[in-house]
Amino acid sequence: MKKKLIIVVGPTASGKSDLTFKLAQDLKSEIIVCDAYQVYKEISKGINKPEIENLNAIKHHFVNHVSINEVWHIKRFKEEIEELINSNMDKNFILEGGSNLYIDCLINNYQLNELDLTLDYSNLSNDELYEKLQKLDFEESLKISKNNKKRLIQALRIIESNNNTKKSVLDKNNKEPLYDFFLIRMIIDRDILYKKINDRADKMFKNNWREEVEQLIKANGNSMMNTNALKALGYDEIYNSIIENRETNLDLIKQKTRNYAKRQETWIRNKFKIDFNFSNYDQYNELLDKCKAFLNDKK
């Protein structure tokens, strides 16, 4: 019988963390945070890490897990999460989606090769990256916006590390899933979501987000922007504003975050098999019953 795992996914600022925490309390579960940036110890102000009280109340895995100077990538995440789950088969885990690709690689059990981290795309413009992707993998280029530099680089790194199209790499390395999943999708009105994103950005900025980046620059020098940790939304704009001695364009950060949330919703809708759509806490008891039934099903 496969290990059963509950997953909560949804766009940023949709309330995933609150729902995951409440479910973990009621199901006596530990939480696995599947986020590409909460894993880092040195950044916190702009990535909505769990509150200290929550971290103390329930075990959260992969939060404050590595230093920004360490190599961290999706392959290492998959290896470590499988080791964690397989060595604790008696425990319940709820996975909180932050980076949908992390969730996708676990659900589909992708066998990932080491990515060539020496491949450097930092000097290429978005247009140059997109043109390169079109030449190497035209089908993949149709799925990615020319403005989404992070995903363009991510796709190119997979393609060039494996000398094959992204689809061929994933198809070749896709094996039978190791676990059974119950996937919960957060549903939230677009206007409400965008207001939450804007309000959260204001709160983060008032909570010394810019000062955090200033301290990172002092501690690590200007080369810090080459670390994966500082590719988190908003950090590049804050970094550039400090280096250029200007005010941070918080409206730009809000706009990029809203665009990111929209892309997340599209990904979730198109890629994942949803078991429960959660839109308000009137549904909570129904959801909890379904989660218990899933965990207790011995099939």
Curated annotation (Swiss-Prot):
InterPro entries: Dimethylallyltransferase, IPT, P-loop_NTPase. Substrate binds at T12, A13, S14, G15, K16, S17. It catalyses: adenosine(37) in tRNA + dimethylallyl diphosphate = N(6)-dimethylallyladenosine(37) in tRNA + diphosphate. ATP binds at G10, P11, T12, A13, S14, G15, K16, S17. Its EC number is 2.5.1.75. Its cofactor is Mg(2+). GO terms for biological process: tRNA modification. Keywords: ATP-binding, Magnesium, Nucleotide-binding, Transferase, tRNA processing. Pfam families: IPPT. GO terms for molecular function: ATP binding; tRNA dimethylallyltransferase activity. The record marks S99 as: Interaction with substrate tRNA. SUPFAM superfamilies: P-loop containing nucleoside triphosphate hydrolases (SSF52540). It comes from the Bacteria. Monomer. Catalyzes the transfer of a dimethylallyl group onto the adenine at position 37 in tRNAs that read codons beginning with uridine, leading to the formation of N6-(dimethylallyl)adenosine (i(6)A). NCBIfam families: miaA. Belongs to the IPP transferase family. This is tRNA dimethylallyltransferase. It comes from Malacoplasma penetrans (strain HF-2) (Mycoplasma penetrans).
